[in-house]
Swiss-Prot record:
Belongs to the NAD-dependent glycerol-3-phosphate dehydrogenase family. It is an enzyme of class 1 (oxidoreductase). Catalyzes the reduction of the glycolytic intermediate dihydroxyacetone phosphate (DHAP) to sn-glycerol 3-phosphate (G3P), the key precursor for phospholipid synthesis. It catalyses: sn-glycerol 3-phosphate + NAD(+) = dihydroxyacetone phosphate + NADH + H(+); sn-glycerol 3-phosphate + NADP(+) = dihydroxyacetone phosphate + NADPH + H(+). NADPH binds at S10, W11, R31, K104, A135, R250, V274, E276. It is found in: Cytoplasm. This is Glycerol-3-phosphate dehydrogenase [NAD(P)+]. One of its GO terms (cellular component) is cytosol.
Length: 330
């Protein structure tokens, strides 16, 4: 099967290598000329994922060349670039390929999920791939399980057949809204978990953050039409666990730096790659206001990131809130 992967960051590189191992004809598209020259000459992508890139994977900066005759096109760019790449795809698309989206985020200007943005430009079936999946582990063939979601289950089944092997297991879920929100909103809680680590707090604090974070993710998700059970699956609690606990998580690492006293700008500069939770915090905070959903952790992380609130004060605000029943609002 011919499959195009658009975006040569960590995840795009990893999924291209994974699919190449399965015997597919893979084209990896990127637009950075320097990165293109580096990969072509060294077969390494040093900044993002410094592993051998097989010679069988075609590398190109020509989008039309990349997608021509492809049966599946994988969008593996950061969420803020999904609109631009979708618009360009519309201009060059030559057949009704399946779109697989890997980006986890909510567009800040429109508050739309990534599949909604893509559907503005393309009539193709869109399949969302989400779940606990560090690129660094997938490329090393560490056993990983993720979830696929689409309005068309048959499209999910095509992707499931094409992407699965003994090290990469994929389940199908019809709840597109829940799968996308779970993958996006957990990054906010991961920032909080990192801030907690940076402040020197312990496992009790992190467990509370993750559990109560899942509660507010579920509240917003249900308000937006999700099945609450989705958040107990791979795209919810699964992704939340890995992102809040692993040092491979950019969101957690950025949070640690902020907890240790660095500004948001300093933390992002040190990470050197996109930290999706930053923009998602803006989007989720606005959605919580619009839909009148109680999201206290998101509110405090927003205050730390964008209003200069001291993290210790944010923790105090959370711990001294009015008394509640645990399942309040769910």
């Amino acid at each position: 099967m011919k499959i195009s992967v658009l975006g040569a960051g960590s995840w795009g590189t990893a999924i291209a290598i994974h699919l190449n191992r399965l015997g597919h004809q893979i084209t990896l598209w990127l637009r950075d000329k320097n990165q293109f020259e580096e990969i072509v000459s060294t077969r390494h992508n040093k900044k993002y994922l410094d592993v051998d890139i097989p010679q069988e994977i075609s590398i190109t900066t020509d989008l039309k060349e990349a997608v021509t005759n492809s049966e599946i096109v994988v969008i593996a760019v950061p969420s803020h670039a999904v609109r631009e790449i979708s618009e360009k795809l519309k201009e060059v698309a030559d057949k009704n390929f399946i779109v697989v989206n890997l980006a986890k985020g909510i567009e800040t200007s429109t508050l739309k999920r990534m599949s909604e943005v893509i559907k503005e430009y393309l009539s193709n079936d869109v399949v969302v791939l989400s779940g606990p999946s560090h690129a660094e582990e997938v490329v090393r063939q560490i056993p990983t399980a993720c979830v696929l979601a689409s309005l068309n289950v048959k499209a999910c089944e095509v992707v499931q057949d094409a992407f699965m092997d003994e090290n990469f297991r994929l389940y199908i879920n019809k709840d597109v809204v829940g799968v996308e929100l779970g993958g996006s909103l957990k990054n906010i809680i991961a920032l909080g978990a990192g801030i907690s680590d940076g402040l020197g707090f312990g496992d009790n604090t992190k467990a509370a953050l993750m559990t109560r974070g899942l509660a507010e993710i579920t509240r917003l998700g249900v308000a937006l039409g999700s099945d609450p059970l989705t958040f107990l699956g791979l795209a919810g609690v699964g992704d939340l666990i890995v992102t809040c606990t692993s040092m491979l998580s950019r969101n957690r690492r950025a949070g640690i730096l902020i907890g240790k006293g660095k500004s948001l700008e300093e933390a992002l500069k040190e990470i050197g790659m996109v930290v999706e939770g930053v923009n998602t915090t803006k989007s989720a905070y606005r959605l919580s206001q619009i839909h009148k959903i109680e999201m206290p952790i998101t509110k405090e992380i927003y205050s730390i990131l964008f209003e200069g609130k001291n993290p210790y004060e944010a923790v105090y605000s959370l711990m001294t809130r009015d008394k509640k029943h645990e399942l309040h609002g769910i």
